[in-house]
């Protein structure tokens, strides 16, 4: 009986790049929907702007490099990068902010290093840090959840604010005019109050903490968690990085909270506020910029979880997701070098 002999690789998969990226984008939909419900149409407008600029920028770069434009645009990587950046910035941020960030992510961070698969840093997070450092006022001007706002940001007001069509419609028109709290996220509010000598208990009596974590933010994180679990089910990502981030952050926050609950934020607050779940399942799991081996992924994820806690607790930025991811990206090659699997035929020693 004759057997067919074929060269390697002998294991094939139907999960091509465009399929993986498409599934990631689809799994973002629950989080985007809940975020839009609580924070208005601005998220959708930012998303549309980011995707448009990302595709135009990628097409322009491919044209300059004499590469296949269609093949690059259809891998859907620009779609994911644009989506992650769009949901990370304030919904009513001016239009030029998302344009600058998207151009930086696609042209500088991604294509300047050679395109998909060659970038060292996560493009969306690198762009986020650039915007945060360069335009701190615009990047920290979050609107309050619509369930608490005095003025509802309908589509007309949203367009006026983002595109600055009318000076009377600025982001501060939609602030939360209760208890002196303005456009601050729960993490921002806690960070500011703790620096002023208030306890966490005193700070969480404010209206923005009408829920156990913060109005709206708990459900936004839950929605991204659901999307992340779907990706695990579809085997788009593996559990190591996400699990290590969540577990490490929970353990570190629990230790601090047990030591001094009046000065350290609770573990539930850390897990379900800010961009924790978005980072754990959609950002840190980027296969290009993360560690590759199972042990390496665990170390990589634990490092991100630890950095998120340390920067949130002792650093100058309330939500440390972007900084933690970029620092871990820098260490990914180092991690891979020291935890790489032993090759077959490797001699242990005498």
UniProtKB/Swiss-Prot annotation:
<feature type="modified residue" description="FMN phosphoryl threonine">
    <location>
        <position position="185"/>
    </location>
</feature>
<comment type="function">
    <text>Part of a membrane-bound complex that couples electron transfer with translocation of ions across the membrane.</text>
</comment>
<dbReference type="GO" id="GO:0005886">
    <property type="term" value="C:plasma membrane"/>
</dbReference>
<keyword id="KW-0285">Flavoprotein</keyword>
<feature type="transmembrane region" description="Helical">
    <location>
        <begin position="78"/>
        <end position="109"/>
    </location>
</feature>
<dbReference type="Pfam" id="PF03116">
    <property type="entry name" value="NQR2_RnfD_RnfE"/>
</dbReference>
<comment type="subunit">
    <text>The complex is composed of six subunits: RnfA, RnfB, RnfC, RnfD, RnfE and RnfG.</text>
</comment>
<keyword id="KW-1133">Transmembrane helix</keyword>
<keyword id="KW-1278">Translocase</keyword>
<dbReference type="InterPro" id="IPR004338">
    <property type="entry name" value="NqrB/RnfD"/>
</dbReference>
<comment type="similarity">
    <text>Belongs to the NqrB/RnfD family.</text>
</comment>
<feature type="transmembrane region" description="Helical">
    <location>
        <begin position="264"/>
        <end position="284"/>
    </location>
</feature>
<keyword id="KW-1003">Cell membrane</keyword>
<feature type="transmembrane region" description="Helical">
    <location>
        <begin position="158"/>
        <end position="178"/>
    </location>
</feature>
<dbReference type="InterPro" id="IPR011303">
    <property type="entry name" value="RnfD_bac"/>
</dbReference>
<keyword id="KW-0997">Cell inner membrane</keyword>
<keyword id="KW-0249">Electron transport</keyword>
<protein>
    <recommendedName>
        <fullName>Ion-translocating oxidoreductase complex subunit D</fullName>
        <ecNumber>7.-.-.-</ecNumber>
    </recommendedName>
</protein>
<keyword id="KW-0597">Phosphoprotein</keyword>
<feature type="transmembrane region" description="Helical">
    <location>
        <begin position="212"/>
        <end position="232"/>
    </location>
</feature>
<feature type="transmembrane region" description="Helical">
    <location>
        <begin position="124"/>
        <end position="144"/>
    </location>
</feature>
<keyword id="KW-0812">Transmembrane</keyword>
<keyword id="KW-0813">Transport</keyword>
<feature type="transmembrane region" description="Helical">
    <location>
        <begin position="37"/>
        <end position="57"/>
    </location>
</feature>
<keyword id="KW-0472">Membrane</keyword>
<dbReference type="GO" id="GO:0055085">
    <property type="term" value="P:transmembrane transport"/>
</dbReference>
<keyword id="KW-0288">FMN</keyword>
<feature type="transmembrane region" description="Helical">
    <location>
        <begin position="298"/>
        <end position="318"/>
    </location>
</feature>
<feature type="transmembrane region" description="Helical">
    <location>
        <begin position="239"/>
        <end position="259"/>
    </location>
</feature>
<feature type="transmembrane region" description="Helical">
    <location>
        <begin position="319"/>
        <end position="339"/>
    </location>
</feature>
<dbReference type="GO" id="GO:0022900">
    <property type="term" value="P:electron transport chain"/>
</dbReference>
């Amino acid at each position: 009986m004759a057997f067919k002999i074929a060269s390697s690789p002998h294991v094939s998969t139907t999960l091509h790049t465009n399929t993986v990226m498409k599934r990631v984008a689809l799994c973002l939909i629950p989080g985007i929907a809940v975020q839009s419900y609580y924070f208005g149409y601005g998220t959708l407008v930012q998303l549309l702007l980011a995707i448009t600029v990302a595709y135009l920028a990628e097409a322009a770069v491919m044209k300059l490099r004499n590469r296949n434009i269609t093949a690059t645009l259809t891998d859907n990587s620009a779609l994911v990068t644009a989506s992650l950046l769009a949901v990370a910035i304030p919904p009513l941020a001016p239009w030029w902010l998302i344009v600058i960030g998207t151009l930086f992510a696609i042209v500088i961070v991604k294509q300047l290093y050679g395109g998909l698969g060659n970038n060292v840093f996560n493009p969306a997070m690198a762009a986020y840090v650039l915007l945060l450092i360069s335009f701190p006022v615009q990047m920290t001007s979050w609107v309050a959840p619509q369930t608490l706002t005095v003025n509802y940001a309908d589509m007309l007001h949203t367009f006026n604010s983002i595109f600055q069509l009318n000076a009377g419609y600025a982001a501060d028109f939609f602030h939360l005019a209760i208890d002196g709290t303005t456009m601050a996220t729960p993490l921002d509010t806690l960070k500011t109050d703790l620096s002023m000598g208030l306890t966490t208990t005193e700070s969480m009596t404010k209206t923005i903490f009408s829920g156990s974590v913060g109005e709206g933010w708990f459900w936004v994180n839950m929605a991204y968690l659901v999307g992340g679990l779907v990706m695990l089910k579809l085997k788009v990502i593996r559990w190591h990085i996400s699990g290590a981030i969540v577990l490490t952050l929970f353990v570190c926050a629990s230790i601090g909270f047990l030591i001094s609950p009046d000065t350290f934020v609770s573990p539930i607050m850390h897990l379900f506020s800010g961009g924790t779940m978005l980072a754990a399942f959609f950002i840190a799991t980027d296969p290009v910029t993360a560690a590759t081996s199972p042990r390496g992924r665990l170390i990589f994820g634990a490092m991100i979880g630890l950095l998120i806690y340390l920067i949130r607790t002792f650093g100058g930025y309330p939500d440390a997701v972007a900084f933690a991811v970029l620092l871990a990206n820098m260490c990914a090659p180092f991690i891979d070098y020291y935890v790489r699997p032993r090759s077959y035929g490797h001699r242990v020693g005498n």
